[in-house]
Amino acid sequence: MGFIENLVQQFENNPRNVGFADLCKVCNHYFGKPRTKGSHNVYKTPWQGDPRINIQNDNGKAKAYQVRQVVKAIKKLQGV
């Protein structure tokens, strides 16, 4: 298992204790470069519907609900 996959596994196990920089690394890997607007990083997803993933820096940590959204989007992308 690679570094990115290990991070995703950690996100699944504990979405409340995720560093913003780690979440950005994972999102950059799966979804490409973000569009940054203010304090939000917005990533596009390749499917119809809600085609965005929105993450914010909360004092160096990522918000837990946003981490869960990223994990869900990665699973959808992988077809799991």
Residues covered by each model-derived region:
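Structured beta->alpha junctions
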Residues: 12-15, 47, 59
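Polyanion-binding surface elements
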Residues: 14-30
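Short, well-ordered coil↔helix boundary/capping segments
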Residues: 17, 37, 60-64
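A short, structured beta-strand/loop element
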Residues: 29-55
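C-terminal structural segments of small proteins and small subunits
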Residues: 57-80
